[in-house]
Amino acid sequence: MFKDRCQPKRCHLECIAFCPPQRTGTEVIWIGQETGKAEISEETCIACGICVRKCPFDAIRIIGLPEELKEDLVHQYGKNAFRLFRLPVPKKGSVIGLLGPNGIGKTTTVGILSGETAPNLGHYRRKKPHWDEVLDYFKGTELHDYLEKISLGDLKTAIKPQYVDRLNKVYRGRVRDLLGKLDKGGRLEALREPLGLPSFLDRDIGQLSGGELQRVAIAATMLKDADVYFFDEPSSYLDIYQRLQVAKVIQGLAKEKYVVVVEHDLAVLDFLAETVYLMYGSEGAYGIIAEPRPVRTAINVYLGGYMKEENIRFRDREIRFESRPPRGDWKAETLV
């Protein structure tokens, strides 16, 4: 259910009226007392799809999941809400990449790995997830030790957010003053030239372009004294030269730290990461994290749209890059 789209007061409750089991007396869809929105019983729903077609606000999706995935549920936001399956494993000394379309849980994944969100393992009714249960669930896996350190606060994290254009709404003042407050270890000097900061250090945050805000956000993240660094789309707004410079700086940071990068630019990801986790699913409904692959293999699989090992096709077409524009039929104009 897309709760933000569901508007029971503006429709005739078509989802309830046309539901076959509902019409025979089985409760499948009802309006929640707390939410005031339609809720669907996943146990009694027969997945006929009639409610999907009848809803005037396009608020319903019915998606069947493979049976084996039910054991891999890491986080669920609520009844009939988004679900995330599996997690990547950060590795100290290397850059881990996340690659996939928008709306399938990359931000949720970063939130869990950074400790901002405790995974509820599908128990969404609990107000506060139990870390002991989470650690027991991941016992014997590579991820257990990492999550244990996160839960105990033994790992400090720093996140470069995706939407850098909001930076000027939360901070006012000169770039130099902002970065100076964060520079506790005297590392700003080493970042000045690689990130091209000198040209706008003395300008106000509110006067910066998207590319300049991006570089300020990257510098601010790297100046924080952390053990784990997350960079959400660090190449956005940057030209090709700036992207490569940023990639080099992030690579240097990863020598002694955990680094996780969410990136859509395949060239930057190829240059930057060693291991990539592909993510696929349905936007706003669920996201699945595939097994790790070497970066070149992951990119080729992503372009092909088919994961041979998992026997999963996550895109109905292959992405191809032509070395030159395709030749079209050219017809000469008849002059006589």
Located regions from the model:
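Iron-sulfur cluster-binding cysteine motifs and their immediate structural context
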Residues: 12-34, 39, 50-67
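Helical segment within the ABC ATPase nucleotide-binding domain
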Residues: 243-255
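H-loop/switch region of ABC-family ATPase nucleotide-binding domains
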Residues: 262-264
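Conserved beta-strand-loop-alpha-helix hinge in the C-terminal portion
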Residues: 278-315
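ABC-family P-loop ATPase nucleotide-binding domains
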Residues: 72-86, 123-210, 224
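ABC ATPase nucleotide-binding domain "signature" region
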Residues: 97, 214-221
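Walker B catalytic motif
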Residues: 204, 233-234, 241
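Hydrophobic anchor residue at the start of the ABC signature
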Residues: 109, 218, 246
